[in-house]
Curated annotation (Swiss-Prot):
This is Chaperone protein DnaK. It comes from Shewanella sp. (strain MR-4). Signal peptide: none annotated. The keyword Nucleotide-binding applies. Acts as a chaperone. SUPFAM superfamilies: Actin-like ATPase domain, Heat shock protein 70kD (HSP70), peptide-binding domain. Residues 625-639 have a biased composition (Acidic residues).
Length: 639
């Protein structure tokens, strides 16, 4: 059985870990980094992922996608998506089913399809380390992700060629990473997770007793559209406003300028975590009729803090709700763990310290803890990690729409999963022959104010006065937090059941097609690599041949030289095209045309070899004239 890997699929960065010798190990990617930017770029002939994609973003802003996780499982008309539509350099569009998709070079793509490219890189990183194919993974999601977003994440895994064995909440994974070596006692831990695009707070009880450990999530809360990207955007808007005040030009209309501004803002934000002032200096950011324009703005830490103060305050309300849901007070919390890169900001740490009245722990790596926890959970599933029990919860209440457009809850938020719940409902009208089961997720009483997860009909109900038929609705949430619903007419036994697919979401056929496309691209990628290899070999041969022609000088007959030069030109023409066979044919012809060169090189080598041999013989002859002798020390008393 192959290894199950743990993947933290992040908004800004992603990370992969695997159990190695019983310990979770974070793996380095091909660039030598332990985290990979969650950035994907599409060019004319290839898909670029990670750091290389980030490097080319300035020159290709419309086809470079970042923070795709903020769109996964979302409707185009969602307020959160509409905010992003206006600030992202790439195109966010409405799919036929109402989902938020993206567009690159005329191709419309679903967020799971784009995210799958990051997962493929994580998969390849693990395969390079393990030396074997990887087909199974545990993938983390924000604790406050709804059913649609969890389904979409599983779809991304399938498209990447991974069977997702478990979806695990990010704060829970971080608690696993922190608590796995804490062998005794009972601790209540608050995990404050402020990442690139999402915010979660989870209150988790870790019970360690005689080698057995239980990680029980008591409550969770959060905001799936609040994170480091929002902090960056505040700074980007400030810089754009300052430039407009000074120069009268709006950089927001220039995608290239905005991409440079994004990189500079992110860099400045990071620098201001360790220094009190920094300067954003972007020469030639744009130009008008009067000439090029430069952006130079000094930013203090205090200025940045004032720009994002309300975002930090927004994270505190979910803390209060989570504590209330867990029926705990601040004094009951033993440890506070910070997860996510944005928690490196001193003002965030200060806010958390003030709220909990204690310093957060500094021994948890905020960028790697989630992937480490995912790898530990993978070990639990594969049987490599024993005596660990993980009890997670559903973050939002689940129910159905009943008469008067009311949401009737069947499963309350923060219920431990997996779980089942059932309730009997009836008809609203006389002789009603069918009922529509409309499944909802959320906390509001009004049905329309909650997230619609989908609906289905149970028909064939026997005619009867209203209120008489008995329809039993069963909700079943699996360990991934994904919902299965059934409805049964208790009189006839007729049953209808579905795994909730979001009313949006990808259909089975769409996912299957994307899997096929990914496999086809894998073949294309392989061919592209082979083409590049052939090009590189051809270029290397031309370079070496030119050098040999120069070294041969007049020893190379003119007609041979002409043949070689013609063959080199043919190779150079072939390498500009995309025909691997043509490149290899031209390369072979150059090798054959260079036969005379090889003869000259061999003759020269033999001549040099002969000269060296003669010199060696002369040296040996001189050495033969030397007589070895043993010297005896003569003592004074022997004289």
């Amino acid at each position: 059985m192959g290894k199950i890997i743990g993947i933290d699929l992040g908004t800004t960065n992603s990370c992969v870990a695997v159990l190695d010798g019983g310990k979770a190990r974070v793996l380095e990617n091909a660039e030598g980094d332990r985290t990979t930017p969650s950035i994907i770029a599409y060019t004319d002939d290839e898909t670029i992922v990670g750091q290389p994609a980030k490097r080319q973003a300035v020159t290709n802003p419309n086809n470079t996608f970042f923070a795709i996780k903020r769109l996964i499982g979302r409707r185009f008309k969602d307020d959160e998506v509409q905010r992003d539509v206006n600030i992202m350099p790439f195109k966010i569009i409405q799919a036929d089913n109402g989902d938020a998709w993206v567009e690159s070079r005329g191709n419309k793509m679903a967020p799971p399809q784009v995210s799958a490219e990051i997962l493929k890189k994580m998969k390849k990183t693990a395969e390079d380390f393990l030396g074997e194919e990887v087909t199974e993974a545990v993938i983390t999601v924000p604790a406050y992700f709804n059913d649609s977003q969890r389904q979409a994440t599983k779809d991304a895994g399938r498209i990447a060629g991974l069977e997702v064995k478990r979806i695990i909440n990010e704060p829970t994974a971080a608690a696993l990473a922190y608590g796995i070596d804490k062998k005794q006692g009972d601790n209540i831990v608050a995990v404050y997770d402020l990442g690139g695009g999402t915010f979660d707070i989870s209150i988790i009880e870790i019970d360690s007793n005689d080698g057995d450990q239980t990680f029980e999530v008591l409550a969770t809360n959060g905001d799936t559209h609040l994170g480091g990207e929002d902090f960056d955007n505040r700074l980007i808007n400030y810089l754009a406003d300052e430039f407009k005040k000074e120069q009268g030009l709006d950089l927001r209309k220039d995608p290239l300028a905005m991409q440079r501004l994004k990189e500079a803002a992110e860099k400045a934000k990071i620098e201001l975590s360790s220094t009190n002032q920094t300067e954003v200096n972007l020469p030639y950011i744009t130009a008008d009729a009067t000439g090029p324009k430069h952006l130079v703005v000094k930013i203090t830490r205090a200025k940045l803090e004032s720009l994002v103060e309300d975002l930090i305050i927004r994270t505190l309300e979910p803390l209060k709700v989570a504590l209330a849901d867990a029926d705990l007070s601040v004094s009951d919390i033993n440890e506070v763990i910070l997860v996510g890169g944005q928690t490196r900001m001193p003002k965030v740490q200060e806010a958390v310290t003030n709220f909990f009245g204690k310093e957060p722990r500094k021994d948890v790596n905020p960028d790697e803890a989630v992937a480490v926890g995912a790898a530990i959970q993978a070990g639990v599933l594969s049987g490599d990690v024993k005596d660990v029990l993980l009890l997670d919860v559903t973050p939002l209440s689940l129910g159905i729409e009943t008469m008067g457009s009311v949401m009737t809850k069947l499963i309350e938020k923060n219920t431990t999963i997996p779980t089942k719940a059932q309730q009997v409902f009836s008809t609203a009208d006389d002789n009603q022959s069918a009922v529509t089961i409309h499944v909802l997720q959320g906390e509001r009483k009004q049905a329309s104010a909650n997230k619609s997860l989908g609906q289905f009909n149970l028909d064939g109900i026997e005619p009867a006065p209203r209120g008489m038929p008995q329809i039993e609705v069963m909700f079943d949430i699996d360990a991934d937090g994904i919902l299965h619903v059934s409805a049964t007419d208790k009189k006839t036994g007729k049953k209808q059941n579905i795994t909730i697919k979001a009313s949006s979401g990808l259909s089975e056929e769409e996912v299957a097609q994307m899997v096929r496309d990914a496999e086809a691209h894998a073949e294309e990628d392989k061919k592209f690599e082979e083409l590049v290899q052939s090009r590189n070999q051809a270029d290397g041969l031309v370079h070496a041949t030119k050098k040999q022609v120069e070294e041969a000088g007049d020893a190379l007959p003119a007609d041979d030289k002409a043949k070689i030069e013609a063959a080199m030109s043919a190779v150079e023409v072939a390498t500009k095209g995309n025909d691997k066979e043509a490149i290899e044919k031209a390369t072979q012809e150059l090798i054959e045309a260079s036969a005379k060169l090889m003869e000259i090189a061999q003759a020269k080598a033999q001549t040099q070899g002969g000269a060296q041999e003669g010199a060696a013989k002369q040296s040996n002859a001189t050495a033969d004239d030397v007589v070895d002798a043993e010297f005896e020390e003569v003592k004074d008393d022997k004289k």
